[in-house]
Amino acid sequence: MITHPLLHRTRRHFFQDCGIGVGKIALASLIANETFGATGKPDFMRFPVKAKRVIYLFMGGAPSQLELFDNKPKLQEIEGKPIPPSVIKGQRYAFIQPDAAVLGPRFPFAKHGQSGAEFSDRLPYLSKIADDLTIVKSMHTDHFNHAPAQLFMTTGSGIPGRASMGSWLSYGIGSEADDLPGFVVMRSGGNLSGGSAMWGSGFLPSEHQGVPFREGAEPILHVANPKGIDRTAQRQTLDLLNKLNRGTHGKMGDPEINARIEAYEMAYRMQARAPELMDFSKESQETLDLYGVKKGKSNFASNCLLARRLAERGTRFIQLYHSGWDAHSNVEGNVKNQAKAVDQASAALVQDLKRLGMLEDTLVVWGGEFGRTPMVEASAALNRSNGRDHHPQAFTMWMAGGGTKPGITVGKTDELGFHVTEDPVHVHDLQATILELMGIDHTRLSFRFQGLDFRLTGVEPHHAIKKLIA
């Protein structure tokens, strides 16, 4: 359990109350850093720190593992026939009926690299880095609808209002950057069913929530000051505003007022750093081509490059959401389009981090909220054909870097891709693994709220996936 007896006191407030000079503040900061290193770590830091930061590529809508990673020739053999009742007994689905016919894979597969990992021909770039990836084919989740499943993957709960993974990391271990947020969110491809609760701070102090960068040419608004306002004038205005806010906080005691002060201060610092962060002109043409970045175009590729730049500058948790994978109809066309949008840049991010020497301590995670059914979804009433429904029982994700074992595959599914048959990995197990790679014991990182101790991985026993940790 983390305890913060002065959680809602700002540094500025404390220093003003005590009358400490700026020089002494700087000296105290240096001494504090040295003391922390000498006296040990927080109680929840129980493991070697293998990853210092996370870049999470969330594929909203749920990619079809059967068209990308999990090759099932048996489905082709029995296409058009119903799934055996013994396989589907007791299962629930969002749209299809239990007697829906089998749909075979829409694309050919091949083995790649020394690892022999199988990829469909829709992933020509990722397949080239097969030996850098840790593939998990035995993921399963508790939810079969998008909003709760997306929330479950990102916050550990299918109910809105819980703290997201990035918020937990910001709260627990902070950020390496003083002039950039510790938790940044970028989006492409459309809307998300889970909404902004997926990067919310929940019951944690709101300064730990994710900071969304906008889609388009200007990810951060109002970087430049209005005409006639220089940094000195802005600093004076901000100091006055903060003084008024502190006065209000002294009367009301609302911790959100302190969060607002922190937000204003971060915005002020970001104004100086953001232009350099977002300026791709110093990136080589080779790098731009590697990602597939086009000048003046904002998309998943440019978000991946910006994610690498944020990671270089100390942002702890960077979450990229790319939506559009919900293939209830025409799964073939869906996978063609979405894989084309993300394959090159996803692979480029891993390659770029590796050549910069950053992959070793940067964890990259790729995947959606659940998988897709081996059975076809077809409905004349809904104008759907040759699609796949939601499948929480088994799906595939991959990881790279950050202390994971490259070139291995964890878990298996049955010959139909319906059930996990080896090394099942629950969503909370994945979350526990990410925390452990960051040095954190997931059972000890908690926060007391309304009389309960909450943690990202819930109260049921879950464990990190030791097979994939180097």
Task: List each language-model region with its residue ranges.
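Ligand-binding pockets and gating/stacking loops
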Residues: 1-470
